[in-house]
Swiss-Prot record:
Transmembrane segments: none annotated. It holds the Pfam family Ribosomal_L22. Belongs to the universal ribosomal protein uL22 family. It comes from Salinibacter ruber (strain DSM 13855 / M31). This is Large ribosomal subunit protein uL22. It comes from the Bacteria.
Length: 121
C-alpha cells in the first residue's frame, strides 16, 4: 500500500530542496522527520509537511491507522517548476535578469513489507 502527496510552486530553488531531501531519501518516516527537525534549512518545514500529508493520505485512503515506524519513504523528488523572471536595473540603462525559481515536491510513502520467514526443514 502506498500514497503520495504533491506540493507545487514552492518558492525555493530545486537545488536547495534536493540538498535536504537527499539526506532523508529511503528512510523510515519517523527517522526522516527527526532528521528534518534538526536541519537549519528553510525548506525543511515544507518537506516535513509534505511527508506528513502523504502519511495522512495513506491512512485516509485505506481507512486504518498505521504505525509510523512501518512506513517508509518510497520516493521523494524535487522537480523544477516555472521560473518567474524579473529585471533589475543596471548601469547605463541596461537590465539584468532575476530568476525566481520554484519547485514541485513529490513524496510517496509505502508500508514497509516484512520479509517472510523461511520455514525450517
Amino acid at each position: 500500500m502506498q500514497a503520495r502527496a504533491v506540493r507545487r510552486h514552492i518558492r525555493s530553488s530545486p537545488l536547495k530542496m534536493r540538498r535536504v531531501i537527499n539526506l532523508v531519501r529511503d528512510r523510515s518516516v519517523p527517522e526522516a522527520v527527526a532528521i528534518l527537525d534538526y536541519m537549519p534549512q528553510k525548506v525543511t518545514g515544507v518537506v516535513e509537511k509534505t511527508i506528513r500529508s502523504a502519511v495522512y493520505n495513506l491512512m485516509d485512503q485505506h481507512d486504518e491507522r498505521f504505525d509510523e515506524g512501518a512506513l517508509k519513504l518510497k520516493e521523494i523528488r524535487a522537480d523544477e517548476g516555472p521560473t518567474f523572471q524579473r529585471h533589475q536595473a543596471r548601469a547605463r540603462g541596461r537590465a539584468a535578469p532575476i530568476r525566481k525559481r520554484t519547485t514541485h515536491l513529490k513524496v510517496v510513502v509505502a508500508v514497509e513489507e516484512e520479509a517472510p520467514e523461511e520455514a525450517a526443514a
